[in-house]
Amino acid sequence: MEKERETLQAWKERVGQELDRVMAFWLEHSHDREHGGFFTCLGRDGRVYDDLKYVWLQGRQVWMYCRLYRKLERFHRPELLDAAKAGGEFLLRHARVAPPEKKCAFVLTRDGRPVKVQRSIFSECFYTMAMNELWRVTAEARYQSEAVDMMDQIVHWVREDPSGLGRPQLPGAVASESMAVPMMLLCLVEQLGEEDEELAGRYAQLGHWCARRILQHVQRDGQAVLENVSEDGEELSGCLGRHQNPGHALEAGWFLLRHSSRSGDAKLRAHVIDTFLLLPFRSGWDADHGGLFYFQDADGLCPTQLEWAMKLWWPHSEAMIAFLMGYSESGDPALLRLFYQVAEYTFRQFRDPEYGEWFGYLNREGKVALTIKGGPFKGCFHVPRCLAMCEEMLSALLSRLA
């Protein structure tokens, strides 16, 4: 027991120190003090190599700053709050393409002019998360009003009428459901319902619907988690149907663990650990070089995506959260061992001891393939969210052992 406590304590200190280093990188290099919002296209040393702004990453960074400000005392600092508010105001002014319509841009110029729109819900989802967290740290009702209004629009697009997303209905297109959509909605349900009984009640049934839809992606008699299924929850043919993303399954796993914890469903918890944590790890971990493959084919065929064998930052961040949460909820020491295995690989291969933050893209052997620290898909989100959540869970575990 004493050795376990010492190991947990060492990891808590290691994770906390790394969170401080990661946040120092973003605080120093990413703030646009002229227009508000954040630069996310940052080179290894933090230099800005492109000033385009990606709305989903803007929302994520606002959310992350507010969350740290609210949850961890050492981040309760004016510079975080001021930057989050400036980012939130930038989103309020510029994110929506044609107000009062709710559709948000995917890419903006530095000063906020729309460049590109995606026919998906993800910019809007992270806009919602940002506004809800801003409300929590400022108590300004206008932010919460924005969050709830956008949430209602997202639910309408997903469950009633997607035509507002602008996606054409083509006769040859397969009707499919990506696991990302119910995952994202479940994340929003958890976000808006936190310590808010009214909204928690309002979205309770939606949360259960999301969980059921995610669970439909467990196919082949429980032996595979597939990224895409039919609208009826059946396996699809071809590459689309066989497509697997181990890191995404692990992220879905901790979303479902959090849902099962709030609903007190021990049976669901056990099922999730088996199918969304252990199964993707067994198939997705590279036995030769370590790390999680980015994509896989459920039949063992060669995936068509060029990056399938690369090791990316975010699946490893999500795996750390998933295994530590699984251990915290179940007490199964095998899950704690998997947390240590993933965390050791991740800290060894991804972190940059010279300039701070983490590299995002490694080749199969674990060597750095892209030296950038941020871009269109990597911002101030997966790494600090992982580190902050792991620090909180490790603190709670140590308190239980005391």
Curated annotation (Swiss-Prot):
Activity regulation as described: Activity of the enzyme is enhanced about 20-fold in the presence of ATP.
Tissue: Kidney, liver, adrenal, and pituitary glands the amount being much greater in kidney than in the other tissues.
GO terms for MF: identical protein binding; N-acylglucosamine 2-epimerase activity; peptidase inhibitor activity
Alphabetical keyword list: Isomerase
Oligomer status and interactors: Homodimer. Forms a heterodimer with renin and inhibits its activity.
Family the entry assigns: Belongs to the N-acylglucosamine 2-epimerase family.
Annotated protein name in UniProt: N-acylglucosamine 2-epimerase
Gene this protein is translated from: RENBP
